[in-house]
Each structure stands twice: as C-alpha cells, then as structure tokens.
A protein has these predicted regions:
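N-terminal flexible segment immediately upstream of the FAD-binding catalytic core
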Residues: 1-59, 63, 79-109, 248-258, ...
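Conserved glycine-rich FAD pyrophosphate-binding loop
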Residues: 42, 70, 75-77, 84-91, ...
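FAD-binding subdomain of flavoenzyme oxidoreductases
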Residues: 101-103, 113-115, 119-244, 452, ...
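A conserved active-site cap/scaffold subdomain adjacent to cofactor or substrate pockets
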Residues: 261-296
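Short connector loops at secondary-structure junctions
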Residues: 411-415, 656-682, 702-707, 733-736, ...
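Iron-sulfur-cluster electron-transfer modules
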Residues: 510-513, 543-721, 850-918, 922, ...
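Redox- and metal-dependent alpha/beta enzyme cores, enriched for Fe-S-associated oxidoreductases
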Residues: 650, 661-662, 743-794, 863-886, ...
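Short, flexible loop segments at boundaries between secondary-structure elements
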Residues: 721-741, 778-779, 822-854
Length: 998
C-alpha cells in the first residue's frame, strides 16, 4: 500500500489530498509564502491533510509517517508568524480542528484540553465553573496545542508568565509512536519545541478563580516617562494581571478608527487586574502616574483591539506591515528602541517606508515582549518585497544585540534558538534545566530521520533544507542594511507571476486575500466551520488558499485551479457573520458571492420538465388560471415534487383558488446568485408577463422567495416595470390563517439559507401555537451541490447527526437530508399533517448516470485531450522558442492551434457519447433531452474538477523530446492550460450542439 492508501483506509473522510485542503494549510500570520514567491524554495504545501478525531488516530498517522519516512506537521489555527505550523518539506499535515474536547477539573483548577481547542473555548468552559484562564496568547482564537508548542506569552503574562508556567501536564505522541505524559521539569521537552519532539494530544491548563477584570489606562507624553514607569512596575511589584503598552501612533490610530479608550498621540499603558485587587492596584497606579506626570483614566480590555493581533489588524487596514516579536530584559528597552530608530526611522511615526512603532507586554520575570511594526508601500506580491522583508531581519538582529531573542524560532532563526529556549524563556532555567539541550538531544536520539516538523527550531540535515536559504538571505540583508532602499529602487519590480496567474482564476478575491492577517476570528463565528471543522470551510482557510496557490505556482512553475476548487472555497451560504468580526473589514461574504458566481455561470442549464401536479380532483380544483393569487412551484421543486402536491392539498383545505405555475418555470434564482444579470432579466421578463396583474406570489422554496421578494423588486426597475405583488412563503400564510394546538411538541426547525427574512416570524407563530422550537442554522448544501462543491454531503450529514429528525423550511434541503439517510420533512408537510392531510408521495421518473458511465466519460475526455494535443505536437514544438516572450505573447501564437485542439476534442468525445445516448435512450422511457443533459452535465463536471497542468504532463514529456532548442517549459505549460480553460465553454458548446441532433 502507498501512504495515501493507508491514510485513506485509516481516516476515511478525514483524509484529504485535494488542492483546496493542501493550499489552505500552507499559510500562517507571517511572511513564509512571500519568501517562497521571492525565490526561496521551501515546500510549504502539504501533500496530505488529515483530521484526527482521537489519540488513536494520531498514533496511527504517526506510525504511517514513520513507516514511509514522510514528514509530519501539527496544525492548530495557523496564527503564529514564524512558519511553525506549516510544512517546510511537504508531507502529512495534522489539523486538530476535530480534537477540541475540554473538561474542567474544578478541584485542582485545571482544564483538560485536546490540542485543537481554542483558548477562548477553554475560557468559556472554565467560566461556567467559576474559573478562568490564568494567561493565554495574544491570539485568543489560537489553539491550546499551538500555544504550548510555541510556549507563547500574552494576556496575563505579567502575573503568570509563559504558557509553560501555566501547564500542569502534556501528553504527546513521540517520534517512536508512543504516548508519553510529561509533567514538571519534563515539560521542557515539549513547551517551545514547536512540534519537533512530539505531537501534543492532551494538556492540562492551570486555571484561577473567576473575577471580573478592571482596566485603568495611564497616558504619558514621553517615552522616557513610560520606560521609567515600566521599571516601577517591576520594582514595586504591583499586583496587576496584565500590563500592555501602546506606542503613540498605535494609540492614535486605534483611538480614532475604532473608538478605543486610549489617548491619541501619547504612550498608553493599559493595566488589567481582578476587581478583587482594586484597593491594592489603583492607589499604586495613581501614585506612579502622579510621580511621573501621567494621566489616569478608565480603560477597557474586552475589545478585539486589546490583543496584539488586533493591533496588527488595525494597522494593516492602511498598509502592509513588517513586524517582529522579540523578548528582552526591561532594562534594555531604551537601547533597543534607539537602535531600531537608527534603522527604521522615527519612533511613533508610522508611515509607508518610514518610521516605526511598538506594542509592549510585560512578563513576570522582568521580560518584555516587544512587538515592533514598520509600514511599507510595496505590495506583498511585488517582486521587490524581499527587500522590505529584510527589515524584519534587521529588527530581529537588534533584539539579539541587546541580549534578547525572538518570541518563536520556527523556520527563521535556528541560530538563536538557544537564546529563546534557555536565556529569555526562564521557566525551565529557573528550575536548573537547559531546555535547549534537552530538546536538541531528544530530537537527535528519537528522530534521526527528521520526521517531526522538519526545518523548525534546528538546522535540518536531511530534509527541509530550503529553510537554510533564509539565513543566507538574512545575512545579505544585514550586509547591505544601509543599501536596502537603493537596491530596492534599482531592482525590477512588478507583480510576481504567481499572483498574476492566480488572479486569472479568482479575480478580486485574490486581491482581498492579501489583506487577511490570519487572526482566525472569522473561524470562531463561522457556522459552516462549526458544522464541518475543516479549514477550507472557514474564511481564513479560503484566503490562505490564495497565498498557498501563489506559492505553489512559484514552486512548480504552473498551476491549474479547477472550478470545483473555486466552488469548494466559495460555497458557503453567505450569512455575513464573518463580515461583522473581521478587524480588517474585508467584505468577505460579498467576495464569496462574486467568486461563487464565476463557477455558477458555467454550469449547464438543465432542461425544463413539467411534472403533472393535478393527479386528482382535490389538487386540480385549486388551480384557477385567472386568479390574482399565484402558487409558484418552479424547477426548484423538481427534486421534491411531493411538497408541491401537499401544498395544493393545504390550499384546498384553506379554500383558496390560485394560479399554479408548474415545475418547468424558472424564477432565475441561479442566474441571480451567479451574477448572470442578462440571463436573469430575460427570465424575469418572461415570468412577469406570465404573472401579470397578480397581487400575491406564494412560494414553496426559500430560493424562489428571495428571488421574487428581492431580485424582482430591484431588477424590475431596470426594465421600466414594477413588481407590485406581495411575496409570501406558504408556511407563513398557513400559520397566520389556520388554528391548531402544538401541545408543547418539540420540533427541530432547520432555517434554510434564504429563509432568514421570515424565519423569526415563523418561529414566533409556531411558539404561539404551542410548539417548542429548536432553531437549527446551517446550510444543507442542497443548492451548493449544484455549484460543484464537495461540501453538500458533509454539511447534510453533520446537521443530521447532531439533531436527528429535522423539519426544514426548504424542500431542497429535505430531499438532501433524506438522500444521506436523515429523517426530514418540510414545514409545509408537517403543518399538513397537523391539519389531517395525508402527505403525498411522488415518484419522479428521472435519469442518472451510473458510476461506470461517469468513469468512462472522464477517461475518454482525458484521453481525447492528450490525443488532440499530441496530434499538434510538431507544430507546437516549432513555436516553443517563442516562449521566451512570456505567457501572454506566446498564447497569441498558439491560440489557433489550441482552438483546433478544442474542436477535435469536442468532435471525438461527441461521437463516443452519441452512441451511448442512443443505447441508453432505447432502454428507458425518459425523454432523450434529459439523458443528453445528464451526459453534458457530467462532461462539465469532469472539466470542472480536473487539474489541467497534471493532465498535460505526458504531453509535455513528448514535447520535450521534440524540441532541440532552448525554450521555457513553464510558459508553454501555462499558455496551453490558460487557453484550454478559456475555451472550455466553447468545448461544452460543441459537444452540446453535436449531441442535440442525436
């Protein structure tokens, strides 16, 4: 068996090797991807991503990694900035998003946590028991495993020190595949080891009694005053919990932009302390402020801007930041700042390419965590970015010069690992333990093949050697430190090729992804991530995908992003919760709508099918073609037509006569959400003529409700018409009109994506009638399934497993739930049962391709692509030398050749499919048009899922043998891939046209 086969067998759906998962796990808060697309060849893209659910899963994955000598990397939330949690040599990435269990030992005041739980989650559990965290990293949404592995410090470190000071025990899977429990001094083996000595699977986190937190802020005019006050805090041992210092520029910007309670243009010291200590802390603060000329006022700490990631977000909103975390003794602060000022410009004057500012946290052992920021005007995808990244190195050098260290080592500063682990991180040196030596020796003895997180903490000898290029580049930066600006001006700039290439696929989404600071706040609120805790299903993962894609292009010279990958990262239900928490204010949901529309536009439209709805007198008597009241059934009910029959029976019970619009009608919903305006308007005009003079449209699906109530109202004005009708969901009409008793019956009500506008009203009326409603939010995936994404089954199963029997507002969702074995009905059917109406069954005569047919289409399409290209290999070989002119110019040369290739593919595949369609048609009563549509749909699916750069590899090998002169193979590959993608719609059109005459 191969690595892939063993992992798939062990983990099933929790093993992934698709492009989306791999790329979304190749980025963190720092600049590693930028190093890659600046030319340093570090393989940051994992080959496989696994989501363990248990310690047993982790042990099994480790054993596979050891067996095949494949590197393994643990991943929490990717909020670190030193590359700790992303690969340096591909391999297996362990994402702990599905190991998040937390329990509280109240007696010993310990939270027992799995590695994927966030500090915020642990704090919530603790507070429910009257306890809370003693300290946590500045990223509240980072994970327990990540915080311990990096031995972070952050909020509360003034009183409680590093994370290692607040860890009671850790259980790891070591490089022999054994489960080991570490306590006391032995924690030196794992705390700060960055996953190089073992994979954390459980930890005990120390807690304290809960107390409300008070905040006072002291503002000072000068740096000198602030530095003296920092010394006073240590000399007087003021019993605060956390102390944070904001520089003048940071204070001004956050105060003005986010209304934070800070004094603009001043140094602000925010002091946090338990309210129970207010009588001890406040008098001392007031005395210090009076002595050193400070002004005291009430502060606040609960805003997102309170943490370091918040500061980065605030500043990032106006330009790209280069920042560095360092640990120094507090007596070295002035020396550090003076040295940085010589290198970076004026302190407190943060402007593009000039000046810097700092954010400082006090740690209990007289250690300061200094976060220095400088701003640059260069785009992160500019070829000159490497020169600005050198400023990061210069800052690092200044920390080391004053006897300090980086906060973390990661892939960047192996030579300074001892400073970090033994000199500045005093948790273990105070116990007489040389942590650096403990980790180094254990690593050498137990992991000689460098399987565990290679390239981190220590210089690699076997694998991940690309990271060794970083110190060489750092040394160059230090050598030319005063010539960086000159070198930058003289060097050719412009966007890196990888970004230009990826933007062809993702458009504006690619631009905005560069603004993401990887704070992971969007992850915490994302309902789809809560349903399916996998990285691509959270906005952070979606944005990380882009930077990972740019890096992978730069690593391998080509990359094709199939539509299925775009559908996967954009296929959420656009609830907008992420928009509300994003500190950089990226319009995430709007971007995802636009991105999803790029795929939706390409999906072949299904043929109109009119199902018979009037099967008896009861249903037929409801229909009145002259009625001003319309029941819109529409094509969305094709997947669940029994709901339409039941709806007619309900309307009959209510005594209504309505005009019924059947299943062949299309409201234009898919065109509306896809941004296909012209097509939508065309359908809208047709429908408005059909429902002219109507005063009420009764809808059965939330999708049609949204289309008529929002889109028609807006778009009708563009065509000089007005949609005067009222739009009402049938469920709401029934609840308003019919009297019955709920008898305290419990119902799990699924609120479908496009029903949010009326869902609260429905819940209110159900409650008034005596039902106990449990609200279920989360997309079933029924509509997303039409957009090629793989989320649909996962989401439906996740909802069903959590809630059991479901009543949903969406007929499509009900059908989707049932298709994966979940008991589900629509609210319409539920209400019909309460009215004594027998719900209907409807057997739809349909046609679906079996797996063998799908496999055949895929095989023949790939075969035809290669055969058609191979037939043109000689002429393409003759043009290969022109590849030196670049992709865009070379495309112009070979475009006629690729057009001919596309035409040949279309003719060949059409011929093969025509005979199959004729054969299938003779075996079923289904209309041939439906059969043809299924074949065309499957061709479209294959085209939307294949990665053309991989498909082309055999052809490129053949081409190589035909070309005797020098040429740029990357240019040739990318030109052919791009042209094939651009002519995909032409290929579909050729096949559709050829098959229509079958």
């Amino acid at each position: 068996m191969t690595v892939e086969e063993e992992l798939r067998k062990l983990l099933g759906e929790n093993f992934r090797d698709d492009l989306v998962e791999r790329l979304s796990h190749s980025v963190d808060f720092g600049f590693v991807p930028e190093l890659v697309w600046s030319g340093i060849k570090i393989n940051i893209v994992p080959d496989y991503v696994v989501y363990p659910r248990s310690v047993e899963d982790v042990v099994n994955v480790v054993k596979v990694a050891l067996k095949y000598k494949v590197p393994i990397v643990p991943y929490g939330r990717g909020t670190n900035r030193y590359g700790n949690a992303i690969p340096a040599d591909g391999g297996i990435l362990l994402d702990f998003s599905k190991m998040t269990n937390v329990s509280i030992d109240e007696t010993n005041k310990i939270a027992i946590s799995e590695p994927g739980a966030t500090w915020k989650l642990v704090d919530i559990y603790a507070q429910q028991k009257g306890l809370q965290l003693r300290t946590f990293p500045s990223s509240y949404d980072s994970t327990v495993g990540g915080g311990i592995a990096s031995d972070a410090l952050g909020i509360g470190s003034y009183e409680y020190g590093f994370i290692s000071d607040n860890t009671s025990f850790v259980e790891i899977v070591n490089p022999k595949g054994e489960i080991v429990r570490l306590e006391g001094k032995d924690l030196a083996l794992v705390a700060g080891a960055e996953g190089t000595t073992g994979i954390i699977v459980k930890a005990g986190v120390k807690l304290r009694n809960f107390s409300p937190t008070e905040a006072l802020t002291i503002s000072f005019e000068s740096l000198d005053q602030m530095v003296k006050v920092i010394g006073e805090f240590y000399r007087q041992v003021i019993p605060a919990w956390h102390v944070q210092v904001r520089g003048p520029y940071i204070s001004t910007y956050i105060a003005e932009r986010y209304k934070a309670p800070l004094s603009p243009q001043k140094w602000n010291m925010v002091v946090l302390y338990p309210s129970s200590r207010s009588t001890l802390v406040e008098p001392k603060i007031n005395r210090i402020a009076q002595e050193y000329g400070g002004k005291v006022f009430e502060g606040e700490w609960t805003g997102w801007w309170s943490f370091n990631h918040g500061v980065a977000a605030a500043l990032r909103a106006q330009g790209l930041l280069i920042h560095q975390h360092g640990l120094i003794h507090y007596t070295k602060l002035m020396e550090l700042l003076n040295n940085l000022e010589k290198t970076l410009g004026k302190l407190g004057d943060l402007s593009p390419d000039g000046g810097f500012d700092v954010d400082i946290a006090l740690e209990k052992r007289e250690v300061l965590l200094v976060n220095s920021f400088t701003q640059i005007s260069t785009s992160p995808v500019d070829k000159k970015i490497l020169y600005d990244l050198a400023k990061n190195t210069l800052m690092m050098d200044e920390y080391i010069k004053v006897g300090g260290s980086l906060l973390s080592v990661g892939i960047f500063a192996h030579k300074y690992a001892k400073n970090r682990l033994s000199s500045m991180g005093k948790t273990f040196s105070d116990l007489g333990v040389d942590r650096y030596e403990v980790i180094r020796k254990y690593k050498e003895e137990t992991d000689p093949d460098e399987i565990f997180n290679p390239g981190k903490l220590f210089d690699p000898k076997i694998r991940a050697k690309g990271v060794l290029e970083i110190p060489r580049r750092q040394q160059e930066a230090l050598t030319f430190r005063f010539g960086i600006g000159i070198a930058k001006r003289l060097s050719p700039g412009g966007e890196v090729e990888g970004f230009k290439h990826i933007r062809r696929y993702l458009e504006d989404f690619a631009d905005y992804s560069l603004m993401c600071i990887d704070c992971a706040m969007c992850v915490t609120v994302c309902p789809q991530y809560r349903l399916i805790p996998q990285w691509p299903y959270a906005p952070k993962g979606m944005f990380d995908f882009v930077r990972g894609a740019i890096a992978l292009y730069e690593l391998q010279g080509s990359l094709d992003i199939p539509d299925s990958a775009i559908a996967e990262i954009s296929g959420c239900h656009k609830c907008g919760l992420c928009d509300g928490v994003c500190p950089v204010r990226i319009p995430i949901s709007t971007l995802l709508i636009k991105l999803n529309s790029l795929v939706a536009k390409k999906i072949p439209e299904e043929p109109a099918v009119e199902l018979s709805l009037f099967s008896d007198q009861e249903t037929a008597s409801v229909n009145d073609p002259n009625s001003q009241y319309v029941l819109w059934v529409g094509k969305n009910l094709l997947t669940n037509p029994a709901v339409a029959i039941t709806a007619l029976k309900v309307l009959n019970k209510m005594g209504l006569k309505i005009k019924v619009i059947g299943t062949s009608a299309d409201s234009g919903f898919m065109d509306y959400i896809s941004g296909n305006g012209n097509k939508f308007i065309e359908k809208m005009k047709k429908n408005l003529n059909n429902i002219e003079n109507s005063i009420e449209i009764i809808t059965l699906s939330p999708e049609d409700y949204r289309t008529f109530s929002v889109a028609y109202k807006d778009y009708s004005k563009l065509i000089g018409s007005n949609a005067y009708f009222e739009v009402v969901p049938l469920e709401l009409r029934v609840l308003k009109s019919v009297i019955f008793d709920g008898n305290n019956e419990n119902i799990n009500l699924h609120i479908a994506c496009f029903s949010t506008e009326y869902a609260d009203e429905i819940i209110k009326r159900l409650s008034e009638k005596g039902f106990k409603v449990r609200k279920i939010e989360g997309c079933s995936g029924a509509v997303l399934e039409k957009n090629l994404g793989r989320r649909a089954d996962l989401m439906a199963k996740a909802i069903g497993e959590r809630y059991g029997k479901i009543i949903t507002l969406c007929p499509l969702a009900a059908a989707k739930f049932r298709s994966v074995g979940i008991e589900a009905i629509t609210l319409i059917e539920f209400l019909a049962q309460k009215l004594g109406i027998q719900t209907s069954q409807y057997q739809v005569v349909s046609f679906q391709l079996d797996q063998a047919s799908k496999d055949y289409i895929r095989k023949e399409l790939l075969s035809d692509i290669l055969a058609s290209l191979n037939s043109q290999v000689n002429i393409i070989a003759d043009t290969a030398t022109f590849s030196s002119s670049g992709v865009e110019e070379y495309k112009k040369i070979i475009e006629p050749i690729v057009v001919e290739v596309v035409e040949n593919i279309g003719k060949s595949l059409s011929s093969k499919l025509a005979s199959l369609i004729t054969q299938k048609s003779s075996q079923t009563s289904v209309d041939k048009a439906i059969i043809i549509a299924e074949y065309i749909k499957e061709v479209s699916n294959v085209l939307s899922t294949i990665e053309l750069d991989k498909v082309l590899q055999p052809f490129m090998s053949l081409l190589r043998s035909k070309v005797s002169e020098e040429y740029d193979e990357k240019v040739v590959t990318n030109a052919i891939v791009q042209l094939l993608r651009e002519y995909t719609e032409k290929l579909k059109s050729i096949i559709s046209s050829n098959l229509s005459g079958v």
